[in-house]
């Protein structure tokens, strides 16, 4: 049972649950102590004076480009296309915009329509004249399967994470999301967090070894059918990595975000105390 719970948590990083704005409000009010979060939001909150830090990273790039008709094979081929993107100014949008800017592709020549959430984007995608949608797994795979049922040819486009690595000269990974926690709460419950870390690692190993069973559990927590959960696992790039273990990769990502838009991090890179675990 615990195995599926871990998978559910991983999916939440891509926007399975509440919105990033709800997250920010809950931290500010002191209501939330342990949160799934896009990896830039924790830094932003800390730079605004909130006592939060990073516990771990749970995905190295959960968003996929899904296309209607034929695949959009490269970032340059986005020019002149209509693209649906959930969560304006949050992770899927940030990655797309930073990639376009780095490759000197005029963002004004890409027609972007924003959806409030990934499930809303899945709903809009088949009906209108959209060429592609950027979605976290398992919603990306769910939209591929949905296309089959309604007679629309939906295919994977270029790999956003690989394109990112090539553009920025980094490993093909984007530490997109993970768990952040209230600092005091973390230090007061250090032993429990150590157990939690091992439980998450065990859960991920179990999920990857028992995909069908994991999907049976996961479908109760995520807005996607069982086949999408099984097929979408590899594309979710799930991981369980303590912040300190992948600090170099995270800081490299933050440096890229600083060059693109410092406001995404609240104006500066995090201090060393940000990495709790």
Placement of each model-derived feature along the sequence:
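Pocket-lining segment of extracytoplasmic ligand-binding domains
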Residues: 39-41, 120-217
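Solvent-exposed, polar/charged alpha-helical surfaces in well-ordered, non-transmembrane soluble domains
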Residues: 25, 29, 43, 76, ...
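Short, glycine-/small- and polar/acidic-enriched structural segments
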Residues: 1-106, 111-113, 131, 137, ...
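Soluble non-cytosolic domains of exported or imported proteins
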Residues: 17-21, 36, 86-94, 119, ...
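Conserved C-terminal helix/tail region of periplasmic/extracytoplasmic solute-binding proteins
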Residues: 251, 255-277
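Secondary-structure end/capping motifs
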Residues: 186-260
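Surface-exposed patches in mature extracellular/periplasmic domains of secreted proteins
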Residues: 112, 207, 214-217, 265-270
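Short, surface-exposed acidic
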Residues: 107-110, 222-234, 265-271
């Amino acid at each position: 049972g615990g195995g599926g719970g871990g998978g559910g948590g991983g999916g939440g990083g891509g926007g399975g649950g509440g919105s990033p704005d709800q997250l920010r409000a809950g931290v500010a009010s002191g209501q939330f102590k342990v949160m799934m979060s896009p990896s830039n939001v924790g830094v932003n909150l800390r730079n605004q004076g909130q006592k939060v830090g990073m516990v771990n990273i749970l995905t190295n790039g959960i968003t996929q480009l899904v296309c209607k008709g034929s695949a959009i094979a490269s970032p340059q081929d986005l020019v002149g296309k209509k693209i649906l993107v959930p969560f304006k100014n949050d992770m899927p949008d940030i990655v797309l915009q930073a990639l376009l800017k780095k490759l000197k592709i005029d963002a004004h020549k890409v027609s972007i329509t924003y959806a409030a959430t990934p499930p809303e984007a899945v709903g809009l995608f088949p009906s209108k004249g959209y060429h592609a949608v950027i979605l976290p797994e398992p919603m990306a795979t769910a939209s591929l399967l949905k296309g089959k049922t309604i007679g629309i040819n939906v295919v994977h486009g270029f790999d956003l994470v690989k394109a990112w690595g090539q553009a920025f000269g980094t490993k093909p990974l984007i530490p997109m999301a993970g768990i952040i926690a209230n600092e005091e709460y973390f230090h007061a419950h250090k032993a429990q967090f150590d157990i939690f870390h091992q439980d998450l690692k065990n859960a991920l190993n179990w999920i990857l070894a028992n995909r069908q069973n994991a999907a049976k559990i996961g479908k109760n927590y995520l807005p996607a059918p069982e086949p999408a959960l099984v097929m979408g696992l590899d594309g979710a790039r799930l991981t369980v990595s303590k912040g300190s273990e992948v600090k170099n990769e995270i800081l490299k990502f933050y440096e890229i975000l600083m060059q693109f838009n410092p406001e995404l991090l609240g104006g500066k890179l995090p201090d060393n105390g940000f990495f709790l675990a």
